[in-house]
Every structure is written in C-alpha cells, then in structure tokens.
Amino acid sequence: MVTIRLARGGSKKRPFYHLTVTNSRNARDGRFVERVGFFNPIAAGAEVKLSVNQERVSYWLSQGAQPSERVAQLLKDAAKAAA
C-alpha cells in the first residue's frame, strides 16, 4: 500500500521531517517514491514551518495513497492556511 508519511531528518534534538510518498513496507527513512513537502516543528521567526506541494499530494491521494494520521492533520492545516 502506498502511504504519505513523515521521514525524519535533522540532527539530534533538532527534528526536521520530509513528507514522502512511499510503500508502507519500506523503512521510515528508507526508499521513497517522491518527496512532496517538509515540516519543521521547531521553526522560529521567519522560517517556514510547513511546505506542501498540494498538486502532487492531491494526485497521490487520487491514486489511492493513504496519509498517516499526522500527515492528514498537516494537510488539513496547510489547506486552511492556503485558503
């Protein structure tokens, strides 16, 4: 099953996540099909906290990809911010 989920990056105590489209059987930070955005939970000041390529996300959702719980919430927040 294809999922849209977060892959952790960054360094110790400074998390940074990529929104990736991947096979659900692959490792969390392993092989992916496409990166469709990023999430920086500790963004401060003028730094961008969330960036999502809505066009590609809607394509993958139409192809049957399932977002993880956290990604579904982030997509909802991104749609609200864009409106």
Curated annotation (Swiss-Prot):
Pfam annotation, one family = Ribosomal_S16
Keywords, comma-separated and alphabetical: Ribonucleoprotein, Ribosomal protein
Q: Does the keyword Phosphoprotein apply?
A: no
Any one GO cellular component localisation term in the record: small ribosomal subunit
Q: Which SUPFAM superfamilies match?
A: Ribosomal protein S16
One GO-annotated biological process of the protein: translation
Q: Which Gene3D superfamilies does the annotation name?
A: 3.30.1320.10
**Top-level taxonomic group:** Bacteria
Q: Does the keyword Ribonucleoprotein apply?
A: yes
InterPro entries, per the entry:
Ribosomal_bS16, Ribosomal_bS16_dom_sf
Q: Which GO terms describe its molecular function?
A: structural constituent of ribosome
In which family does this protein belong, per the annotation? Belongs to the bacterial ribosomal protein bS16 family.
In Swiss-Prot or TrEMBL terms, this protein is called Small ribosomal subunit protein bS16
Q: Source species, please?
A: Pseudomonas putida (strain W619)
- Tell me the gene name: rpsP
